[in-house]
Each structure stands twice: as C-alpha cells, then as structure tokens.
Amino acid sequence: MSKSDYYDLLGLSKNATPEEIKKAYRKMALKYHPDKNPGDKAAEEKFKELSEAYDVLIDKDKRAAYDRYGHSAFSDGSGRGGFDFNSGFSTDFSDIFNDLFGGGFRGGRSSSKRQDGGTVGSDLRLDIEITLEDSFNGTKVPINYVTHVKCSSCSGSGSEGSVKSVQCNTCHGAGNTRTQQGFFTIERTCHVCNGEGEIIKNKCKKCSGSGRVRDEVNLLVTVPKGIESGDKIRLNGKGEAGYRGAQSGDLYVYPNIKKHKFFTRNGADLYCNVPIKMILATLGGHIEMPSIDGTWTKVKVPEGSQNGDKLRLKEKGMPVINSSRRGDMYIQITVETPINLTKQQKELLKKFDEEPNTVECNPQSTGFFQKVKSFWNDIRSS
C-alpha cells in the first residue's frame, strides 16, 4: 500500500514554513489523538501517519531528503544517502506534544496534578449582593455553598488503617504508561491507578478512597471598605478539596453592589442629581445634602447657577480600597422650571422679561438667538 504524501496529509504546500507545519500538525493531532478517540483504530493509524509526517517535515535535513527522494529516502538500504527508517523516526512524540501543546494531553503530568500524585481541587466562584453602604463601611457577609470537602473519617488520605497506599505495579508510580508502536511511543494515563501512581489497599468507606465528600460549607466573608462591583475576594484553600489530601482550590467571592436610590458611583467618586428652584439658582443660597457616611452638609449654591453645573464636596465620596483616602462627591444641579403658575405669577414673569436689562440677565440665550438671526440674514443676502 502506497504511503500518503506528507504535505497532503497536513494540508500544506511544499513551501510551508516551520510555523505553518506546527500549526497544521497541532490542528490535526488534536483531532486524531488516541486519548480523544479511545478504541478507534482508524484514528490511531491516522495519528501515526500525521506524527511521522511532522517528524520529517519539521526537521531541515529530513525534509530536504524527502523533497528530493520522497518516501524512498527513508527506506532500508536506499543507497541514496538517505535516512535509515528505524533511526530516522526515533523521536518520542510526547516531546512533540510538550513543545506544541504545553503538556496539556493526559499522559504527561498535568498542571492540575501535584508532585505526589493527588489532583488539586478546583477553584470556585460565588456571587453576593451588597449595598453601597456596605461597601462604604465594610461588612461581613455569611455565605454557604456545597462542594467537596476533606473526608473527616480518613483525614483526606482515602485510606483506612496505617498503610495509606502502595505504588501502582502497572505504571511503577509514574501515573502513565508508554506503548512502543513501531517507530514512536504513545503515552497514556495508567488505567489501573487513573494517573495517580498509587493504589489504596483499604479504601475509606465514607469517601470510597477519594479523600473527600460532598458537604455544605458555611463561612463569614469579610468585605473590605471601598470594594466595587467586579472586584473579587480570594479565600485561600476554601474551594474544592483536593483528591486524596492534595491541595484545595480557592474560593473567589464577587460582590455586586445594588443600585442606590440617590447616588451613582464612578471609582471612589459619588454623583447625584439635585433639582433646585429657579429662584435659588438665580439668587444663590444653600441646600442641605446627605452624605454616604450618614452626615448632612450645608452646600452653597452660587448665584446664577445653570442647569448641569456641578458642585464638588471634597472627600465625601467612597473610601479608596486599602487606603485612608476618600473620593469626592459631585452634585449636579437641575434647575426646575416652574409649572402651574397663577395669573399673577405669569404677569410678574412677563414684566420681568420686558425689563430693559434682560439681555444682561440671559447672556447665553440672547447671544444664541443673535447668532441665529445673523446666520439667517447671511443666507438671505447670498
């Protein structure tokens, strides 16, 4: 049976760069890897062909020989100065995976494993709701969640009795087995110890040898002053318990601050909209304003204040997290136009508008309409 062209196998042109070869092989190897296709002989054979093609094309000398002589360059006794077949593909393909995939396939020691074989517990996430006042003052929030916790009967070892575990005779403690198939090696997770490298002789009846059981956890979370929505609180070791005494994961608590009826927040600064009467905006005066700390502050409104003007109260905002500083509070003025006026009130306003100095009293609107009039005259005269 003739062998497939290496370039065609990987879907490459003969001018492919090493980066393109690696990318193509990675894509195809992920699809046909034996760990992803257990028991599929066709996938296993395809994987062998892909690995052979990669081994040749990624090597400068082997690729040059292949480009010149084709598959015959690697035949026994080719007589063309080519490579011996058996020595030409001596690569351990687990090295290829470590290079291309970062050791992510099962069969190597995964990053989720600790050195002595136990699987580290997963990190957990929990969302809580707090008020803006809780964020200002700091608070403690009771939480509860269900996860794997360390088994109390065996203290997490998974074993009953003095002998905790013995080395797996199949993988000899490595957690994986290697099978030589022709010119390369396939590495798989040991099916006897499931990659742990150890076997428990007398399993704990409560946890069935896992060293952990499902249970409810109740904690009191300390929420620091100044925390914002999107921040996270990390509780070390409060996540899922590790397998057979391995390290537990962490718990991440994400606070969500409820919408406040008065304030909006931007970082450590607080903002609020305050409607004031037209007469107050015109003549100036004072208003009493509540702060997030529960105190009241007398705030001066300048004479001639306009709609949208902002008044700043220094250090009346939120605490800066892990600091003694505070943000500011900004009051945005909304000048309220009077409604439901009496006839007498309307006459007074008309009389005021007819006063000769109203141009100076309303410089923005007067100036605007003068510009409009000038613009219109320019159009008519053009």
Curated annotation (Swiss-Prot):
Domain of life of the organism encoding this protein: Bacteria
Annotated signal sequence range: none
Zinc finger (CR-type): 138-216
SMART domains: DnaJ
Cofactor: Zn(2+)
Principal cellular location given in the protein's record: cytoplasm
Stated family: Belongs to the DnaJ family.
NCBIfam families hit by this protein: DnaJ_bact, PRK10767.1
Its job: Participates actively in the response to hyperosmotic and heat shock by preventing the aggregation of stress-denatured proteins and by disaggregating proteins, also in an autonomous, DnaK-independent fashion. Unfolded proteins bind initially to DnaJ; upon interaction with the DnaJ-bound protein, DnaK hydrolyzes its bound ATP, resulting in the formation of a stable complex. GrpE releases ADP from DnaK; ATP binding to DnaK triggers the release of the substrate protein, thus completing the reaction cycle.
Protein name, UniProt field: Chaperone protein DnaJ
Originating species: Ehrlichia ruminantium (strain Gardel)
Primary gene name: dnaJ
